[in-house]
Amino acid sequence: TQVRSRRLMKELQDIARLSDRFISVELVDESLFDWNVKLHQVDKDSVLWQDMKETNTEFILLNLTFPDNFPFSPPFMRVLSPRLENGYVLDGGAICMELLTPRGWSSAYTVEAVMRQFAASLVKGQGRICRKAGKSKKSFSRKEAEATFKSLVKTHEKYGWVTPPVSDG
């Protein structure tokens, strides 16, 4: 739709103007509706930042696909690499964040704001780069991420979204 296209063009321009190089975007196959987003920064006091330095990981790569009714529905967002553990990143690279669900989404959210929230959630959830032999090399799959996300939304719709206590990170 035109609304989606206009909004995504504006989002791309705004991201290109970011002074802190927090994220960068590459279009997948030149599609305005399928983005690979590089998250270059997380909290520098976090174990995840330490992991990134120790493994020479310059960024966390995510894929965002924007539905026809974006910005009124959220993008589907998943981690592509590196393989992460915890930090609300689940099987297939699915991300457990209420704001990525239809109920939690607001059309006012920008991609930059969503990425900043994701970076904070990764650290809060004590995300780490997976270093287990064999497992760390296995890439996440979209199909697995979609199935996991569908399942987690169902669970949260039934039981609600709980903010973990501060003691949990």
Predicted region positions:
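UBC/E2-like fold recognition across ubiquitin and ubiquitin-like conjugation systems
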Residues: T1-F59, D68-G169
